[in-house]
């Protein structure tokens, strides 16, 4: 990941499962929405794993490895759906040498032993406790990642700002205004956490 353009704050977006390019595909619409709403202030990086139709943790781990190796300044982290859970797993287990200024998790599933490849270790959040701001977003009637997943993350991140959203959105094709507002509310030169 190249150094961000002068004056722009860097955002790394970890995508959902499935195809990622084109309207209605995975995280694509949400990323395009964020780029349109945050342009001029933020630079959004949207790396995609190899063959996203067949996601594995190893593919995400490889992608995060090269993406984080290129980060030289504080970064805002966003994880959407599977991208959120793999981002948490990577951050807590690999502990990359980055400065995270905030963590945003959208429609993030909590994998149990039936999907142990993506399962988080017990007390994973202990390795992330110094991230200055954690935000959680989940639709009350999400059919892809049921609402009870949010309860798990609320318990793990006790000081998180939680946005319980009406409806059943999971991919947020029409955008997520609350996310834009929260990103813009971050302090300009706020604290960051080195993992």
Predicted regions and their residues:
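Conserved alpha/beta-hydrolase "acid-adjacent" motif
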Residues: 143-149
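Catalytic histidine neighborhood in serine/cysteine hydrolases
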Residues: 43, 154-171
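Catalytic histidine-centered segment of alpha/beta-hydrolase-like enzymes
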Residues: 55, 168-180
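Short, surface-exposed "cap/lid" segments of acyl-processing enzymes
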Residues: 2-53
């Amino acid at each position: 990941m190249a150094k961000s353009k002068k004056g722009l704050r860097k955002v790394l977006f970890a995508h959902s499962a499935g195809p990622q390019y084109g309207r209605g595909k995975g995280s694509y619409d949400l990323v395009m929405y964020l780029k349109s709403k945050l342009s001029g202030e933020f630079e959004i990086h949207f790396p995609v794993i190899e063959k996203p139709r067949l996601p594995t943790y190893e593919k995400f781990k490889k992608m995060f490895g090269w993406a984080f190796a290129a980060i030289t300044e504080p970064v805002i982290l966003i994880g959407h759906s599977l991208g959120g859970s793999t981002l948490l797993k990577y951050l807590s287990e690999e502990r990359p040498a980055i400065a995270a200024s905030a963590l945003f998790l959208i429609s993030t599933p909590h994998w149990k032993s039936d999907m142990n490849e993506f399962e988080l270790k017990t007390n994973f959040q202990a390795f992330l406790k110094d991230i200055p701001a954690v935000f959680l977003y989940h639709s009350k009637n999400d059919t892809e990642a049921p609402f009870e997943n949010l309860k798990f993350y609320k318990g793990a991140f006790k000081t998180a700002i939680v946005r319980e959203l009406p409806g059943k959105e999971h991919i947020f094709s029409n955008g997520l205004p609350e996310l834009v507002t929260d990103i813009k509310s971050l302090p300009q030169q706020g604290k960051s956490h080195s993992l």
